[in-house]
Amino acid sequence: MALDDIHTPVLLERCLELLAPALQGEGAVLVDATLGMAGHSEAFLDALPGLRLVGLDRDPDALAIAGERLARFGDRVHLVHTVYDGIGRALDGLGIGEVQGVFFDLGVSSLQLDRVERGFSYSQDAPLDMRMDGTAGLTAAQVVAEYDELELRRIFYDYGEEKLAPRYASRIVQAREVEPITTSARLVEIIQQATPAAVQRAGHPAKRVFQALRIEVNQELSVLARAMPAAIDRLAVGGRVVVESYQSLEDRIVKRELRVRSTSTAPVGLPVELPEHRPELKLLVRGAELADQHEIAQNPRAASVRLRAAERARRRHA
């Protein structure tokens, strides 16, 4: 199967349009903090011959595929196995200080969803794993087995925004006392049995629970909350950050960080805005951009995307 059949980059042309003005110089550095199968990055490297890429990913399988895909670019590309809140350490390890661009394409990748054995999908039976890095960390099966009822309720509420969180947490605890819950099919069965018929008609009842477990297993929101400021701190003046998120919890973190950094810190009533009070960032899009119907028809994954972008206007202490 061709890579493009597995993963079509979301809003590719718009992302390139937003990043390109900051990446024109020879030797400009772009960090793709969520490299995946490198669909976006391959296009960026083709379009910008002087560009150097630092690609980060926690998934060794994705890094291997990306490495093959980008091999033709030679020493213009450096790949690092790390979670994206490790951006500072990754750049330090390469001897790179400031960068001209940072790109995030958040959420679970097509590769992870399509490989049944990874356990991300509620529509196919597989071991309950859900780790983006299959070499480290708790699995979803361990979370389901070891968290108490209140902890399960919390993650279903907080990370899945699931109204039936108490019911699902209770049923899971009851079921695991009979036998371990180790597969996605068994977890789906428990959730379906606990779901009122009227709710089942509104969509798959396991969707939010699986999202919550995935976020907990991979600590996605806490990682993002650390990664956003770390990435912005490495941007050179004139550098740009572009972020694609796919659910409201991620987008809320991105929106908050960009809003804070793009707001003047001048005290209310100060007659003159001093240079140190000027915003660090200038927003490049109004609110969050969504995909149009043409893009969604070509690439259904784009249906839930929210794109935000900003440019570094000044250094934090200048």
Curated annotation (Swiss-Prot):
Report the subcellular localization.
Cytoplasm
Q: Which residues bind S-adenosyl-L-methionine?
A: A38, G39, H40, D57, L91, D105, Q112
Q: Catalysed reaction(s)?
A: cytidine(1402) in 16S rRNA + S-adenosyl-L-methionine = N(4)-methylcytidine(1402) in 16S rRNA + S-adenosyl-L-homocysteine + H(+)
Q: Per the record, GO CC terms?
A: cytoplasm
- UniProt-listed InterPro entries: RsmH, SAM-dep_MeTrfase_MraW_recog, SAM-dependent_MTases_sf
Molecular function in Gene Ontology: rRNA (cytosine-N4-)-methyltransferase activity
Under which EC number(s) is this enzyme classified?
Answer: 2.1.1.199
Keyword list, A-Z = Cytoplasm, Methyltransferase, rRNA processing, S-adenosyl-L-methionine, Transferase
Q: Which GO BP terms apply? A: rRNA base methylation
Q: What does the UniProt record say this protein does?
A: Specifically methylates the N4 position of cytidine in position 1402 (C1402) of 16S rRNA.
Q: List the HAMAP family.
A: 16SrRNA_methyltr_H
PANTHER family, per this entry? 12S RRNA N4-METHYLCYTIDINE METHYLTRANSFERASE (PTHR11265:SF0), S-ADENOSYL-METHYLTRANSFERASE MRAW (PTHR11265)
Q: Which family does it belong to?
A: Belongs to the methyltransferase superfamily. RsmH family.
Protein's recorded name: Ribosomal RNA small subunit methyltransferase H
Which species is this record about? Clavibacter sepedonicus
Supply the source organism's classification.
Answer: Bacteria, Bacillati, Actinomycetota, Actinomycetes, Micrococcales
